[in-house]
Amino acid sequence: MAHKKSGGSSSNGRDSAGRRLGVKKFGGQKVAAGNIIIRQRGTKFYPGANVGMGKDHTLFALIEGAVAFVTKRNNRTYVNVAAPVAQAAE
């Protein structure tokens, strides 16, 4: 017997949870070694100085310092971590 499915409410009602992607530490913020700076799909941002990239393209700090975003002439945005300047003891 041929039946037409009407509405489709039971076959359509689902969605996946958000993946919590994006920038976790912004420019100028202090980070410790191992801190996640950006979670991303693909290379929207590229690792620069003192920044590593995981297999899922997550960017993380390799040293303690401050985050800096730099856009180069090839229109790629690189994420750097600048080492903190040591204070002179007085």
Swiss-Prot record:
GO-annotated molecular function: structural constituent of ribosome
Q: Which parts of the sequence are annotated with region: Disordered?
A: 1-22
Gene3D superfamilies hit by this protein: 2.40.50.100
Q: Which GO terms describe its cellular component?
A: cytosolic large ribosomal subunit
State if Chaperone is listed as a keyword.
no
Coiled-coil annotated residue ranges, if any? none
Instruction: List the PROSITE patterns hit by this protein, alphabetically.
Output: RIBOSOMAL_L27
Q: Which Pfam families match?
A: Ribosomal_L27
A GO biological process of this protein is: translation
Which UniProt keywords are listed? Ribonucleoprotein, Ribosomal protein
Stored InterPro entries: Ribosomal_bL27, Ribosomal_bL27_CS
Q: Ribonucleoprotein: is it a keyword of this entry?
A: yes
Membership in a protein family: Belongs to the bacterial ribosomal protein bL27 family.
**Name of the protein:** Large ribosomal subunit protein bL27
Q: Which organism is it from?
A: Caulobacter sp. (strain K31)
